[in-house]
Amino acid sequence: MSDLRITEAFLYMDYLCFRALCCKGPPPARPEYDLVCIGLTGSGKTSLLSKLCSESPDNVVSTTGFSIKAVPFQNAILNVKELGGADNIRKYWSRYYQGSQGVIFVLDSASSEDDLEAARNELHSALQHPQLCTLPFLILANHQDKPAARSVQEIKKYFELEPLARGKRWILQPCSLDDMDALKDSFSQLINLLEEKDHEAVRM
Protein backbone atom coordinates (compact mmCIF):
# COMPACT_ATOMS: atom_id res chain seq x y z
CA MET A 1 0.00 0.00 0.00
CA SER A 2 1.38 3.42 -0.99
CA ASP A 3 2.13 6.13 1.56
CA LEU A 4 -0.73 8.19 0.07
CA ARG A 5 -3.29 5.43 0.63
CA ILE A 6 -2.04 4.88 4.18
CA THR A 7 -2.37 8.60 4.88
CA GLU A 8 -5.89 8.62 3.41
CA ALA A 9 -6.87 5.64 5.58
CA PHE A 10 -5.65 7.37 8.72
CA LEU A 11 -7.40 10.59 7.77
CA TYR A 12 -10.66 8.70 7.23
CA MET A 13 -10.33 6.98 10.62
CA ASP A 14 -9.69 10.38 12.21
CA TYR A 15 -12.83 11.67 10.50
CA LEU A 16 -14.91 8.79 11.83
CA CYS A 17 -13.59 9.40 15.35
CA PHE A 18 -14.39 13.10 15.02
CA ARG A 19 -17.95 12.30 13.90
CA ALA A 20 -18.44 9.90 16.79
CA LEU A 21 -17.12 12.34 19.38
CA CYS A 22 -18.31 15.71 18.11
CA CYS A 23 -21.37 15.09 15.97
CA LYS A 24 -23.21 12.70 18.22
CA GLY A 25 -25.03 15.57 19.93
CA PRO A 26 -26.10 15.89 23.55
CA PRO A 27 -28.16 13.11 25.10
CA PRO A 28 -31.90 13.76 25.08
CA ALA A 29 -33.12 15.68 28.12
CA ARG A 30 -35.11 13.76 30.70
CA PRO A 31 -38.77 14.81 30.84
CA GLU A 32 -39.85 16.71 33.94
CA TYR A 33 -43.19 16.30 35.68
CA ASP A 34 -44.77 18.54 38.30
CA LEU A 35 -46.39 16.54 41.09
CA VAL A 36 -48.19 17.36 44.31
CA CYS A 37 -47.55 15.20 47.39
CA ILE A 38 -50.21 15.14 50.11
CA GLY A 39 -50.99 13.16 53.24
CA LEU A 40 -51.54 13.64 56.95
CA THR A 41 -48.79 14.82 59.29
CA GLY A 42 -46.72 11.84 60.36
CA SER A 43 -47.44 9.79 57.25
CA GLY A 44 -43.78 10.07 56.24
CA LYS A 45 -43.95 12.27 53.13
CA THR A 46 -40.86 14.31 53.95
CA SER A 47 -38.78 11.30 54.98
CA LEU A 48 -39.59 9.34 51.82
CA LEU A 49 -38.81 12.25 49.50
CA SER A 50 -35.61 13.08 51.38
CA LYS A 51 -34.51 9.45 51.11
CA LEU A 52 -35.12 9.47 47.36
CA CYS A 53 -32.98 12.62 47.12
CA SER A 54 -30.19 10.93 49.14
CA GLU A 55 -30.53 13.48 51.94
CA SER A 56 -29.59 12.65 55.50
CA PRO A 57 -32.58 11.47 57.58
CA ASP A 58 -31.09 13.31 60.56
CA ASN A 59 -32.02 16.65 58.98
CA VAL A 60 -35.66 15.79 58.22
CA VAL A 61 -38.22 18.20 59.68
CA SER A 62 -41.97 17.85 59.10
CA THR A 63 -43.28 20.24 56.46
CA THR A 64 -45.48 22.95 57.95
CA GLY A 65 -46.36 24.83 54.76
CA PHE A 66 -44.99 23.41 51.55
CA SER A 67 -41.64 22.47 50.07
CA ILE A 68 -40.43 21.56 46.59
CA LYS A 69 -37.92 18.85 45.76
CA ALA A 70 -36.52 17.78 42.40
CA VAL A 71 -36.40 13.99 42.65
CA PRO A 72 -34.15 12.53 39.92
CA PHE A 73 -34.73 9.19 38.22
CA GLN A 74 -32.98 7.62 35.27
CA ASN A 75 -35.77 8.41 32.82
CA ALA A 76 -37.42 11.48 34.36
CA ILE A 77 -37.17 14.24 36.95
CA LEU A 78 -40.10 14.67 39.32
CA ASN A 79 -40.60 18.17 40.70
CA VAL A 80 -42.57 17.32 43.82
CA LYS A 81 -44.48 19.97 45.74
CA GLU A 82 -45.04 18.53 49.21
CA LEU A 83 -47.86 20.07 51.25
CA GLY A 84 -47.99 19.99 55.04
CA GLY A 85 -50.55 17.63 56.51
CA ALA A 86 -51.64 19.38 59.71
CA ASP A 87 -55.35 20.01 60.34
CA ASN A 88 -55.03 23.76 59.85
CA ILE A 89 -53.15 23.36 56.54
CA ARG A 90 -55.14 20.64 54.79
CA LYS A 91 -58.04 22.98 54.07
CA TYR A 92 -55.68 25.02 51.87
CA TRP A 93 -54.32 22.08 49.84
CA SER A 94 -56.48 22.81 46.81
CA ARG A 95 -54.83 26.21 46.37
CA TYR A 96 -51.64 24.39 45.34
CA TYR A 97 -53.11 21.84 42.94
CA GLN A 98 -52.97 23.97 39.80
CA GLY A 99 -50.38 22.82 37.28
CA SER A 100 -49.97 19.36 38.78
CA GLN A 101 -49.45 16.46 36.39
CA GLY A 102 -49.71 13.72 38.98
CA VAL A 103 -50.45 13.07 42.66
CA ILE A 104 -48.56 11.25 45.41
CA PHE A 105 -50.69 10.42 48.44
CA VAL A 106 -48.84 9.04 51.46
CA LEU A 107 -50.68 7.35 54.32
CA ASP A 108 -49.49 5.78 57.55
CA SER A 109 -50.59 2.16 57.34
CA ALA A 110 -49.93 1.74 61.08
CA SER A 111 -51.89 4.80 62.22
CA SER A 112 -54.84 4.96 64.60
CA GLU A 113 -58.37 4.34 63.32
CA ASP A 114 -59.17 8.05 63.61
CA ASP A 115 -56.14 9.08 61.54
CA LEU A 116 -56.83 6.37 58.98
CA GLU A 117 -60.38 7.65 58.58
CA ALA A 118 -59.09 11.20 58.15
CA ALA A 119 -56.63 9.97 55.52
CA ARG A 120 -59.43 8.16 53.70
CA ASN A 121 -61.55 11.32 53.63
CA GLU A 122 -58.66 13.38 52.28
CA LEU A 123 -57.86 10.82 49.59
CA HIS A 124 -61.50 10.66 48.53
CA SER A 125 -61.57 14.46 48.24
CA ALA A 126 -58.38 14.47 46.16
CA LEU A 127 -59.57 11.71 43.82
CA GLN A 128 -62.73 13.71 43.10
CA HIS A 129 -61.21 17.19 42.92
CA PRO A 130 -61.67 18.79 39.47
CA GLN A 131 -57.96 19.63 39.15
CA LEU A 132 -56.76 16.16 40.17
CA CYS A 133 -59.43 13.65 39.15
CA THR A 134 -57.92 12.94 35.71
CA LEU A 135 -54.31 12.70 36.93
CA PRO A 136 -52.26 9.59 37.75
CA PHE A 137 -52.19 8.79 41.48
CA LEU A 138 -49.47 6.99 43.42
CA ILE A 139 -50.85 5.95 46.82
CA LEU A 140 -48.13 4.84 49.23
CA ALA A 141 -49.07 2.73 52.27
CA ASN A 142 -46.07 3.77 54.34
CA HIS A 143 -44.57 2.37 57.55
CA GLN A 144 -44.96 -1.24 56.47
CA ASP A 145 -42.04 -2.06 58.76
CA LYS A 146 -44.17 -1.37 61.85
CA PRO A 147 -45.93 -4.27 63.63
CA ALA A 148 -49.34 -2.58 63.42
CA ALA A 149 -49.11 -1.92 59.68
CA ARG A 150 -52.17 -2.86 57.64
CA SER A 151 -51.72 -4.78 54.42
CA VAL A 152 -52.32 -3.29 51.00
CA GLN A 153 -55.46 -5.40 50.66
CA GLU A 154 -56.80 -4.06 53.97
CA ILE A 155 -56.03 -0.50 52.88
CA LYS A 156 -57.67 -1.01 49.49
CA LYS A 157 -60.83 -2.35 51.10
CA TYR A 158 -61.03 0.26 53.88
CA PHE A 159 -60.41 3.15 51.48
CA GLU A 160 -62.95 1.73 48.99
CA LEU A 161 -60.49 2.31 46.18
CA GLU A 162 -61.88 -0.12 43.64
CA PRO A 163 -65.27 1.61 43.20
CA LEU A 164 -64.00 5.14 43.86
CA ALA A 165 -60.99 5.09 41.54
CA ARG A 166 -62.54 3.00 38.77
CA GLY A 167 -61.48 4.34 35.39
CA LYS A 168 -58.64 6.39 36.88
CA ARG A 169 -54.89 5.83 36.68
CA TRP A 170 -53.76 4.83 40.15
CA ILE A 171 -51.26 2.62 41.95
CA LEU A 172 -51.39 1.47 45.57
CA GLN A 173 -48.04 0.27 46.86
CA PRO A 174 -46.64 -0.72 50.28
CA CYS A 175 -43.45 1.05 51.32
CA SER A 176 -41.08 1.90 54.14
CA LEU A 177 -37.76 3.68 54.51
CA ASP A 178 -36.11 0.28 54.92
CA ASP A 179 -37.03 -0.88 51.41
CA MET A 180 -35.70 1.61 48.88
CA ASP A 181 -35.98 -0.83 45.98
CA ALA A 182 -39.75 -1.10 46.49
CA LEU A 183 -40.06 2.67 46.86
CA LYS A 184 -38.14 3.36 43.66
CA ASP A 185 -40.17 0.73 41.84
CA SER A 186 -43.37 2.50 42.94
CA PHE A 187 -42.14 5.77 41.48
CA SER A 188 -41.06 4.01 38.27
CA GLN A 189 -44.63 2.78 37.87
CA LEU A 190 -45.88 6.33 38.40
CA ILE A 191 -43.49 7.63 35.74
CA ASN A 192 -44.87 5.02 33.34
CA LEU A 193 -48.40 6.33 33.97
CA LEU A 194 -47.23 9.91 33.41
CA GLU A 195 -45.57 8.94 30.13
CA GLU A 196 -48.70 7.09 28.99
CA LYS A 197 -50.80 10.18 29.69
CA ASP A 198 -48.30 12.29 27.71
CA HIS A 199 -48.48 9.94 24.73
CA GLU A 200 -52.26 9.97 24.79
CA ALA A 201 -52.26 13.77 24.79
CA VAL A 202 -49.98 13.79 21.72
CA ARG A 203 -52.26 11.40 19.82
CA MET A 204 -55.37 13.49 20.50
Curated annotation (Swiss-Prot):
PROSITE patterns: ARF
InterPro entries: ARL15, P-loop_NTPase, Small_GTPase_ARF/SAR
Protein name: ADP-ribosylation factor-like protein 15
Gene3D superfamilies reported for this sequence: P-loop containing nucleotide triphosphate hydrolases (3.40.50.300)
Similarity comment: family membership: Belongs to the small GTPase superfamily. Arf family.
GO molecular function, one term: GTP binding
GO CC list: extracellular exosome
